[in-house]
Amino acid sequence: MSYLYDSYFQYIHYNVSMIPTVVKQTSRGDRAYDIFSLLLKERIIFVIGKIENFMANLIVAQIMFLESEDPVKDIHLYINSPGGEVTAGMSIYDIMQFVKPNISTYCIGQAASMGAFLLAAGTTGKRFCLPNSRVMIHQPLGSLHGQATDIAIHATEILKVKENINKLMAKHTGKSIDVIRQDMERDCFLSADESVKYGLVDSVLSKRI
């Protein structure tokens, strides 16, 4: 086992040990549930931290499980993320569009980069920011190295991905593609109210509806 692989699971173990548990009485006696499992029963999913493949697979599995439990009732996605890998984020995005239930999205803390993209991808009319949350949009990041031919191939692919994200952001925000291209050239920060005006979310929530 590699050092990085071992360190990763030490990190997971440490964080799991910090998750609160709740003891509930059942017909078979007391049973301890971690807080996230209890919230999942209420159809609440969290996108917390960097978006990468491991996390994305968990999010996808939870969304599909909740659809199988009830294909009509809304799913609630709470986002507090600095962004992350485009391919991981797109796997979550595609499942959000694929499943039958409406998906409400909520920005708590921050939704940056791919986090902002997923925030905007919720069901229209059901996308929210909490009052002191922040949103940041920008173009996909890429780091290229290797042979010149490979660099050219990857550069072309990055431009394709960038344009695809621009088109999808235009679709979900109602902005023109030209406005999206311009605004996403550099880091663009928005407050909760500014995110509503931009079309990334539909309203600011200070109290649960």
From Swiss-Prot:
Family per similarity comment: Belongs to the peptidase S14 family.
GO CC term, one of those recorded: endopeptidase Clp complex
Stated name of the protein: ATP-dependent Clp protease proteolytic subunit
Keyword line: Cytoplasm, Hydrolase, Protease, Serine protease
Compartments it resides in: Cytoplasm
GO molecular function: ATP-dependent peptidase activity; ATPase binding; serine-type endopeptidase activity
Transmembrane segments: none
Positions of the catalytic residues: 113 (nucleophile), 138
Job of this protein: Cleaves peptides in various proteins in a process that requires ATP hydrolysis. Has a chymotrypsin-like activity. Plays a major role in the degradation of misfolded proteins.
Domain of life the protein comes from: Bacteria
Catalytic activity: Hydrolysis of proteins to small peptides in the presence of ATP and magnesium. alpha-casein is the usual test substrate. In the absence of ATP, only oligopeptides shorter than five residues are hydrolyzed (such as succinyl-Leu-Tyr-|-NHMec, and Leu-Tyr-Leu-|-Tyr-Trp, in which cleavage of the -Tyr-|-Leu- and -Tyr-|-Trp bonds also occurs)
UniProt-listed InterPro entries: ClpP (IPR001907), ClpP/crotonase-like_dom_sf (IPR029045), ClpP/TepA (IPR023562), ClpP_His_AS (IPR033135), ClpP_Ser_AS (IPR018215)
PANTHER family found in the cross-reference section: ATP-DEPENDENT CLP PROTEASE PROTEOLYTIC SUBUNIT
HAMAP family in alphabetical order: ClpP
A Pfam family hit: CLP_protease
Organism: Blochmanniella floridana
